[in-house]
Amino acid sequence: MPFQQLLSQLPDQALPVLLAYGALGGAYLLVVPLALLLWMNKRWHQMGKIERTAIYGMVFLFFPGLILFAPFINLRMAGQGEA
């Protein structure tokens, strides 16, 4: 039980701070980039200029999280079927 011993040695104020860091890190690396990928996949051909500019800014901001999902996401359009 080394984890419980580690938690008991921390000051009382440290646990909420660690939980807040974990929540913000999870949102930055997982939640927002996944929502951004789904939004781009759904709206790519219907976006206006302002929406596309905002999306590009968010891609720049959340790039580390997007890199984490990049190997698992396929954004290519479906083909016309077999030739």
From Swiss-Prot:
This protein's GO CC annotations:
plasma membrane-derived thylakoid membrane
Report the catalytic activity.
a plastoquinone + NADH + (n+1) H(+)(in) = a plastoquinol + NAD(+) + n H(+)(out); a plastoquinone + NADPH + (n+1) H(+)(in) = a plastoquinol + NADP(+) + n H(+)(out)
Q: Domain of life, per the record?
A: Bacteria
- What does the subunit section of this Swiss-Prot or TrEMBL entry state? NDH-1 can be composed of about 15 different subunits; different subcomplexes with different compositions have been identified which probably have different functions.
One Pfam family hit? NdhL
| Main localization category | membrane
InterPro entries the UniProt entry points to: NADH-quinone_OxRdatse_su_L (IPR019654)
Show which residues constitute the signal peptide.
none
Q: Which organism is it from?
A: Synechococcus sp. (strain RCC307)
What is the protein's name according to its record? NAD(P)H-quinone oxidoreductase subunit L
This entry's Enzyme Commission designation comes to 7.1.1.-
Q: Disulfide bonds, which pairs?
A: none
Report the transmembrane regions from the record: 17-37, 53-73
**The keyword Membrane is annotated on this UniProt entry:** yes
Keywords assigned by UniProt, alphabetized: Membrane, NAD, NADP, Plastoquinone, Quinone, Thylakoid, Translocase, Transmembrane, Transmembrane helix, Transport
The entry's family comment says:
Belongs to the complex I NdhL subunit family.
A Gene Ontology molecular function term of the record: quinone binding
Q: How does this protein lie in the membrane?
A: Multi-pass membrane protein
As for what it does, the entry says:
NDH-1 shuttles electrons from an unknown electron donor, via FMN and iron-sulfur (Fe-S) centers, to quinones in the respiratory and/or the photosynthetic chain. The immediate electron acceptor for the enzyme in this species is believed to be plastoquinone. Couples the redox reaction to proton translocation, and thus conserves the redox energy in a proton gradient. Cyanobacterial NDH-1 also plays a role in inorganic carbon-concentration.
List where in the cell it is found. Cellular thylakoid membrane
